[in-house]
């Protein structure tokens, strides 16, 4: 993705995290923001419908937006109601939607209803190819993966996990592999989540517990010296890939890095609308 657009508090916080990397142009849209070339202040309104109706033409604001676009939004917030009106004005771009799912038990009745509606509508839009894909992120899954997270800086830690993972997968996709059998996902596999794999144990943790996973791609970022010297790495990678290949098309790529530690990232694809 070349452009990241964050909507609402959660969306803007994640978009801001992407700004640490020079590859992305970041835009933020929320109530209370001052109007600048990259920030858009949305008029305070009531509920989803009110915020949707508050959005006028964004042609000037989006005039420099090009290439792939990652649109980031949390489904439970009032400002999220502006999403469809905004996305309509981005339909000529290659849209990827990053959807932040909150624990419904921690939401009020209105927010819970808003999340349920947007969660289903956005997935149906992705399945209809109005988006390239929807990437689902469950905050409760992120907390489980990270373990104990201090209250101060809680969401910053969760957001950093999401952003660093998506960024590294993007980097590896544009890096020559040492070995791979990766192919494009099936046309109908547009409901997606990312995750991490423990290279030592093979334990896999997706950022959203996808049902009916159709395809998985594993990105192995391995220290280059290890790739030159350790003769058992290929067998280890293949064993892990095969272990996770049950009823799923599974592919992988191996990439040399200068990092001391090794990292394994997973992208899972489904064609089925997820339920929560």
Which residues are covered by each model-predicted region?
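Tubulin/FtsZ superfamily GTPase core signature
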Residues: 1-276
């Amino acid at each position: 993705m070349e452009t990241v657009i964050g909507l609402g508090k959660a969306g803007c916080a994640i978009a801001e995290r992407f700004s640490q990397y020079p590859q992305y142009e970041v835009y933020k849209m929320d109530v209370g923001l001052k109007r600048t070339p990259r920030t858009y202040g949305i008029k305070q309104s009531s509920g989803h419908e009110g915020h949707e109706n508050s959005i006028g033409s964004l042609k000037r604001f989006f005039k420099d937006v090009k290439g792939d676009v990652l649109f980031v939004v949390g489904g439970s917030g009032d400002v999220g109601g502006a999403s469809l009106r905004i996305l309509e004005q981005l339909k000529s771009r290659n849209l990827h939607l990053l959807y932040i799912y909150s624990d419904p038990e921690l939401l009020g009745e209105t927010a819970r209803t808003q999340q349920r509606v947007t969660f289903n509508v956005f997935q149906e839009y992705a399945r209809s190819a109005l988006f390239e894909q929807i990437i689902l992120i469950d905050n409760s899954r992120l907390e489980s993966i990270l373990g104990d997270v201090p209250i101060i800086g809680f969401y910053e830690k969760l957001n950093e996990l999401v952003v660093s993972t998506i960024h590294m997968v993007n980097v590896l996709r544009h890096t020559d592999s040492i070995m791979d059998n990766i192919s494009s996902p099936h046309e109908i596999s547009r409901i997606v989540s990312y995750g991490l794999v423990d290279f030592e144990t093979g334990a896999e943790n997706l950022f959203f517990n996808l049902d009916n996973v159709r395809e998985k791609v594993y990105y192995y970022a391995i220290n280059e010296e290890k790739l030159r010297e350790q003769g058992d790495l290929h067998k280890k990678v293949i064993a892990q890939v095969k272990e996770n290949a049950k009823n799923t098309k599974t592919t992988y790529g191996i990439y040399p890095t200068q990092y001391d530690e090794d990292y394994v990232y997973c992208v899972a694809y489904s064609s089925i609308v997820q339920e929560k």
